[in-house]
């Protein structure tokens, strides 16, 4: 699952060997009064395999954790540039949550990928990878992220990959994770060579070689 306002094209540089069935997911406009848990239930209905590896970037990682609760046979959840609990949110987000400012202020503008537009190079990336970005959807994302309760999953079934230069979710707030030196919040795109080299070995380290082929929604 891609991050907020991104499309599944962010995964286009990942290479999967035979035995992996990849199912790319996209954000859909949230329904009226639909919360994150109900949204996760809709996404879970799209996943038919009984042993999926769930991969999510940024807010997509938060969503995949909620999807995992609905799919008891999930193999593992892979978080990329994301948070494993509300305690890993930066302090300013936690303060906004405590004061409920996210219900009255346009916080989506502070969380989205606007920094992609700062150079011509990243502006082109922004245009290529942008997905659903309606004002209603962006406001919903900000609200649901800060309202997220985030009950912990089995730590043995979590893989957390995080860049030490992430400005959206700074590394100092992140707990146990695999650190990517120089990795930013968009490292799935601009550090794709690192992922090509390390991503599959990291996943395979969690999976027994005798297990059957893997379905990978992301």
Language model feature labels by segment:
Residues 25-27, 173, 178-183, 188-192:
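Short glycine-rich catalytic loops that host catalytic nucleophiles or stabilize transition states
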Residues 55-64:
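Gly/Ala-rich beta-loop-alpha elbow adjacent to hydrolase catalytic centers
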Residues 1-50, 96-104, 184:
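Active-site catalytic motif of lipid deacylating hydrolases and related acyltransferases
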Residues 69-106, 154, 212-213:
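Flexible "cap/lid" loop of the alpha/beta hydrolase fold
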Residues 36, 85-124, 128:
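Alpha-helical membrane-targeting segments
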Residues 34, 183-198, 215:
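Catalytic histidine-centered segment of alpha/beta-hydrolase-like enzymes
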Residues 121-155:
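Hydrophobic, aromatic-rich cap/lid helix
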Residues 160-162, 166:
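Short beta-strand/loop motif that positions the catalytic acidic residue
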């Amino acid at each position: 699952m891609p991050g907020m306002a991104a499309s599944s094209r962010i995964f286009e540089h990942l290479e999967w060997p035979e035995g992996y069935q990849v199912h790319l997911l996209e954000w859909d406009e949230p329904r009226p009064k639909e919360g994150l848990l109900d949204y996760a239930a809709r996404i879970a209905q799209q996943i038919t395999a009984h042993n999926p590896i769930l991969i999510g970037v940024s807010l997509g990682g938060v969503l995949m954790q909620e999807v995992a609760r609905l799919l008891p046979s999930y193999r593992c959840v892979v978080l990329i540039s994301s948070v494993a609990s509300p305690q890993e949110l930066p302090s300013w987000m936690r303060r906004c949550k405590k004061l409920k400012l996210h219900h009255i202020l346009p916080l989506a503008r502070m969380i989205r990928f606007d920094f992609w537009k700062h150079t011509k190079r990243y502006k082109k990336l922004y245009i290529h990878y942008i997905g659903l970005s309606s004002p209603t959807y962006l406001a919903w994302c900000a609200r649901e992220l800060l309202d997220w309760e985030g009950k912990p999953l089995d730590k043995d079934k979590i893989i957390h990959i995080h860049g030490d230069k992430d400005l959206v979710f700074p590394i100092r707030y992140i707990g146990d994770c695999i650190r990517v030196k120089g990795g930013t919040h968009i490292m799935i795109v601009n550090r794709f060579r690192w992922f090509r080299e390390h991503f599959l070995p990291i996943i395979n380290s969690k999976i027994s070689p005798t297990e059957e082929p893997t379905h990978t929604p992301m």
